[in-house]
Amino acid sequence: MKFRNILKNEKNEKNEASASTSHASEDIEIIPSRYDNEKFYSATEATHKKKTGSTGFDDTISLTHTLSRSRIPTSMEDEDAEEAEVHDTRVKRALKQRHIGMIALGGTIGTGLFVGISTPLSNSGPVGALIAYIFMGTIIYFVTQSLGEMATFIPVTSSITVFSKRFLSPAFGVANGYMYWFNWAITYAVEVSVIGQVIQYWTFKVPLAAWIGIFWVLITLMNFFPVKIYGEFEFWVASIKVIAIVGYLIYALIIVCGGSHQGPIGFRYWRNPGAMGAGIISSDLGEARFLGWVSSLINAAFTYQGTELVGITAGEAANPRKSVPRAINKVVFRIVLFYIMSLFFVGLLVPYNDPRLSASSAVIASSPFVISIQNAGTKVLPDIFNAVVLVTVISAANSNVYVGSRVLYALAQSGNAPKQFAYVTRHGVPYLGVICTALLGLLAFLVVNHNANTAFNWLINISTLAGLCAWLFISLAHIRFMQALKFRGISRDDLPFKAKFMPWGAYYASFFVTVIIFIQGFQAFAPKFDVSEFFTAYISLILLVVLFAGCQLYYRCRFLWKLEDIDIDSDRREIDAIVWEDDEPQNLWEKFWAAVA
């Protein structure tokens, strides 16, 4: 039963809440939560354990705990309660398994893959870049495993921010929420800035600013459609990406084996100019190569961002207990096929010292995918692949706005953003979140008045660090989640999805993400300190610290929740009670996409 229906009438809900509380008080001590600004109530199990010796997960304690955590309007909330009757604040669970998989894929396969890998290839060489991407791939694998375990157990919208607040502290949750929104809003600016440059591959007759403005409007409007239409659009567009990358891998294999005028290429470019790049900054070759490799880690992190989007879509998934684990389990497949294999073949077909990799005028001209096709002398295909890149970037930008709007929605739902951001259209779209996220995307116009590559790299650095902070909070939240389960006597074997290689995987990801966060701005210190470079590299970290400190002072809460205060019941029981429709693939076509998505 959904508790919002039980508490429909204000007078009845007060009486029922009072009756439920008095009845439950025989077994449970109800204590107002000190730190929750939503006026929720938390129920402790101490008295119940003392009397019954149970673990706190029998039917009585579960029902009472869930009810006690449901929002109960008080006299101070009459105005908000009346307004809630006018403004709908519930998103729709309309995303199927194939939608969720492709949304995550759409947010990941974009500028970072098709354009961004040119920098690590130039700085680190094919082998150095490959090692960097494999290493970052292991980190994102453990991050998504951690998120998957929590998101299937408690499938809520923008779970990445919700879990930080619930399992770490309110300050962590709010700071992470705003930083994660900032990350995707900035990424939207990155993607939109590239769209115009992709089109300029064909013509310069239309100003770059015009293309940026046109596609900014179109993509923003696209996000006002119902989530089901959005999911369907993203599914088919992301399908084009999958077909294009698989097609490129087959094409690249043919070229490597001698299918062009160049003859068999094999590992020719790994021998000359070499498998490892010349590095950056330092005159010492070893040091320069190491610094170049560290720089490649940052590009790899940007490329992988979006893999965790399954956690954002959990709150709008039609069957989260099945669809989210399936999407999570395909992460390894995606990392190997779409990133590692693509980078491997690009490294075989393009030498790291090709001057086009570091082109400063047109970003798309530096795409190693396009360069490799041009080197092979295949006519028309560069134009076709450029069209694929255009569709890819539009899809990625579309996902950016979707994620950003849902993060603001989750913050408003928890009382940490203006309540207006929780208002949705009759189709369940948080329209103010879409508008606010899109407005920050106007930073894309920076590339018009500045060197394209400089502005592009500036936006990437800001976005990447904000995304790395989100990965860190996911891993830390999962560590606390596992500790809370153990404290409550719950075996992880009984969860809908059990993350692999835990808890060591979460510790591994937390440690290396922290290291990368602090060393990623090394170029600000070498060869001499550069103030501008420093703020570009660390502005996201500075914002995070300010947000966290402000939230800590505002909430006056503990640095971390006590294990006994961690809430692992809210939003879970309602999902447990729902009987979902069968979403199993029915024909060969559906089975194919189920395997891919």
UniProtKB/Swiss-Prot annotation:
Coiled coil: none annotated. It is found in: Cell membrane. Keywords: Amino-acid transport, Cell membrane, Membrane, Transmembrane, Transmembrane helix, Transport. The keyword Metal-binding does not apply. The chain crosses the membrane at residues 100-120, 124-144, 179-199, 206-226, 235-255, 331-351, 384-404, 428-448, 459-479, 501-521, 534-554. Signal peptide: none annotated. Its main location: membrane. GO terms for biological process: L-arginine transmembrane transport; single-species biofilm formation. Residues 1-29 are annotated as: Disordered. One of its GO terms (molecular function) is L-arginine transmembrane transporter activity. It is a multi-pass membrane protein. Disruption phenotype: Resistance to canavanine. InterPro entries: AA-permease/SLC12A_dom, Amino_acid_permease_CS, Amino_acid_permease_fungi, APC_YAT. Residues 7-16 have a biased composition (Basic and acidic residues). NCBIfam families: 2A0310. Belongs to the amino acid-polyamine-organocation (APC) superfamily. YAT (TC 2.A.3.10) family. High-affinity permease for arginine. May also transport other basic amino acids. This is Arginine permease CAN1. It comes from Candida glabrata (strain ATCC 2001 / BCRC 20586 / JCM 3761 / NBRC 0622 / NRRL Y-65 / CBS 138) (Yeast).
